[in-house]
């Protein structure tokens, strides 16, 4: 059982960290511009990263995170890995419009209602390095629309664009565990927001969103005092 940390791991651009996921799996990440973390397709069960070189082609995704995520996640500083230099934040993001409404999803033949998702999603240009007010991830602003209303025919164009949300524990932790299982970037938040069919492996992720007893036992049980 892990003890809840008193404060989040201090932020420093270029700091490489490992995060312990469930079932003893570790993943590598790097702090870039606060509050963005870059996650890499590097997983192991020993938390031993000797010989690992961080490359752009090994990036899973980049996401803004809360201090709550760093506080509740088991984080360790990794000094033996050289940080990826000159990383540029993505410029294409998904904006979820205000006016969230309950949506119904189905996993393993069971329908569940989820709250808090926008009525419409847009692919937008949001240059986080422009120096403009739109850079602030808390404000959710952007420069222009690329696709104002994403439809099924736009899914390929949207690709792996991230939503302009700020991730928390434990939804991000479960997403990373899904990336480990599949060996690639998996994005449940995008799949749910765009109305894509959901695989059975998303069951725990949905459990977290619905605050089910199963999810609380799996994740919060280790962190409650």
What are these regions (language model features)?
Residues 107-225:
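A eukaryote-biased signal for long
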Residues 15, 53, 97-99, 159:
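Short, isolated positions within intrinsically disordered regulatory regions of eukaryotic proteins
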Residues 48, 57, 69, 95, ...:
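Amphipathic alpha-helical interaction segments
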Residues 1-64:
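Short N-terminal edge-element motif at the start of the domain
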Residues 62-128:
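Long, low-complexity intrinsically disordered regions
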């Amino acid at each position: 059982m892990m003890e809840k940390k008193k404060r989040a791991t201090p932020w420093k651009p270029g700091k490489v960290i490992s995060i312990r996921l469930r079932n003893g799996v570790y993943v590598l990440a790097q702090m870039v511009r606060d509050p963005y973390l870059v996650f890499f397709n590097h997983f192991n069960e020993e938390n031993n990263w000797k010989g690992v070189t961080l490359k752009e082609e090994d990036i899973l995704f980049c996401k803004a995170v809360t201090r709550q995520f760093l506080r509740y996640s088991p984080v360790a500083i990794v000094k033996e890995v050289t940080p990826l230099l000159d990383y540029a934040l993505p410029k294409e993001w998904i904006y979820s419009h205000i006016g969230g409404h309950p949506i119904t999803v189905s996993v393993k033949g069971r329908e569940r209602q989820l709250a808090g998702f926008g009525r419409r999603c847009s692919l937008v240009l949001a240059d986080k390095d422009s120096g403009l007010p739109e850079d602030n991830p808390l404000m959710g602003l952007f420069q222009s629309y690329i696709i104002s209303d994403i439809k099924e025919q736009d899914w390929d164009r949207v690709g792996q664009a991230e939503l302009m949300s700020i991730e928390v524990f434990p939804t991000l932790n479960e997403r990373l565990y899904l990336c480990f299982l599949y060996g690639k970037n998996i994005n449940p938040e995008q799949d749910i927001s765009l109305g894509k069919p959901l695989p059975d492996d998303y069951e725990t992720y949905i459990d977290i969103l619905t605050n089910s007893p199963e999810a609380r036992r799996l994740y919060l049980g280790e962190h409650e005092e």
